[in-house]
Regions:
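Glycine-rich beta-alpha junction loops
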Residues: 41, 127-128, 201-206, 243, ...
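A short glycine-threonine-serine/GTX helix/turn-capping micro-motif
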Residues: 161-171, 194, 226-230, 234-236, ...
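Oxidoreductase and adenylate-handling cofactor-binding alpha/beta cores
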Residues: 173-194, 207-219, 261-267
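Beta-strand segments within the central parallel beta-sheet cores of soluble alpha/beta enzyme folds
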Residues: 194-202, 307, 389-393
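Aromatic-enriched alpha-helical interface/lid elements that frame and gate functional surfaces
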Residues: 230, 235-311, 315
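Conserved PLP cofactor-binding pocket of PLP-dependent enzymes
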Residues: 309-330
Length: 398
């Protein structure tokens, strides 16, 4: 198998939980060597976060795929110096702590850049550098609230709604990943130096829902919660079927709306400008929704989907986890793969998302035990002797 496009890039990941580690995951899937640095003893809280089996966090296993795991106490001077030795032979540093913590550990950007000018440093934090909140602790939940996401999600008469998964962290990790690749391109292709990448958890998610701030800036309007509707598409909703399943429809273009009308046995609406024109159709969104729901409610999911697929309507079933894993299209694409893990045995995890024809991503292994690669990284890579490593262990440095 061909090497990944990031082969030869070494990443030191000294971040915990979600955003930073997810960026490290993406880089590691496509060939980068990722060395995850954790505190001795407890390690990354992600190891026991969320659902567990035999005490092992399931999310940890997937998020920490392909990573070499080492332990290092960055509060101790010897740990800090060993960390800098690791940075000397690396290309990227991913951190996720507050600026004050990085400064205490001598891994703030000013110190890192002075000692390792070649290094790309990606700092993902709750609020980002600069501003009065820069040194406050922050999790994705706070970003989902501050970004405006929670304000626009939910039913009109209901409370702001937070997602039951790591949305802000995930979006921030994507922004961080492509920023790292751009910074490496600048360094290696244009002959530049390393640089700081400053990503917070609020701004990437706010960018996704920028239509809200645009509406306020230009129209003086503050969009609120509208349930499953979208002000640029009708019909657009989730509809319950006769067998108590659900399907979703999006009709962003007039052509799709016409297909929906014909599929639900209302072909006359496909010729009526009031139901085809995007603006006038949106004004009748509730009426159109009711027509679609009435038709869907009289049919099973299979029958409704068959009719919509025959009419080339953009519709899809609402899946739970089991149905997602069983989808024949995703199975044909190899979306999920089974990986043997020494601790938990066979695990089905999602494959790398982007499919590159010449340099595909791959999963070499799932998350390893705490400090599993201490000897290989500190001994073989950095050249520490067995006696030196033993001394560091006794001091609690590694």
């Amino acid at each position: 198998m061909a090497e990944g496009p990031l082969a030869g890039v070494r990443v030191v990941e000294a971040a915990t939980l979600a955003a930073g580690p997810m960026a490290g995951t993406a880089l590691g899937e496509f060939g980068a060597e990722v060395i995850k640095v954790e505190a001795p003893g407890a390690g990354d809280p992600m190891r026991t976060w969320g659902r567990r089996r035999e005490g092992v966090g399931l999310a940890w296993k997937s998020v920490s795929r392909n990573k070499r795991c080492v332990t290092l106490d960055l509060r101790q001077p010897e740990g800090q110096e060993l960390f800098h030795r690791l940075l000397e032979v690396s290309d990227v540093l991913v951190v996720g702590n507050r600026p004050s913590a990085l400064e205490r550990w001598t891994i703030d950007y000013e110190t890192v850049h002075a000692r390792h000018p070649h290094l790309v440093m990606c700092h993902i934090s709750g609020y980002g550098r600069g501003g009065p909140k820069s040194d406050r602790p922050g999790y994705g939940t706070l970003a989902e609230a501050m970004s405006g996401f929670a304000h626009v999600v939910g039913q009109p008469d209901g409370p702001p709604t937070l997602p039951p998964f790591m949305l802000a962290d995930g979006v921030a990790s994507l922004a961080a990943t492509y920023a790292v690749v751009m910074a490496l391109y600048h360094r290696d292709v244009h002959g530049g130096t390393g640089q700081l990448i400053d990503v917070n958890l609020v701004e990437p998610l706010a960018r996704l829902i920028e239509t809200s701030t645009l509406a306020f800036d230009q129209l003086g309007e503050i969009p609120g919660r509208v349930g499953n509707r979208l002000d640029a598409s009708a019909p657009r909703n989730a509809y319950r079927t006769a067998d108590d399943r659900w399907l979703a429809i999006s009709s962003a273009s007039p052509a799709i709306a016409k297909r929906v009308y014909r599929a639900i046995d209302r072909p006359e609406l496909a010729e009526d400008p009031d139901y085809v024109d995007p603006v006038r159709r949106q004004e009748r969104a509730r009426e159109v929704d009711e027509l679609v729901q009435k038709w869907v409610a009289e049919r099973t999911l299979d029958d409704a989907m068959a009719a919509f697929e025959a009419a080339d309507v953009t519709a899809a079933p609402v899946y739970d986890a089991a149905q997602l894993l069983g989808d024949e299209h995703l199975r044909a694409r190899g979306t999920f793969v089974t990986v043997d893990d020494p601790e938990l045995g066979p695990m089905t995890v999602q494959a790398p998302v982007a499919v590159l024809t010449e340099t595909p991503g791959r999963i070499q292994h799932l998350g390893r035990t705490l400090g599993a690669d201490n000897d290989a990284v500190f001994g073989e890579l950095l050249g520490l002797s067995a006696d030196h490593l033993r001394d560091l262990r006794e001091k609690g440095v590694v």
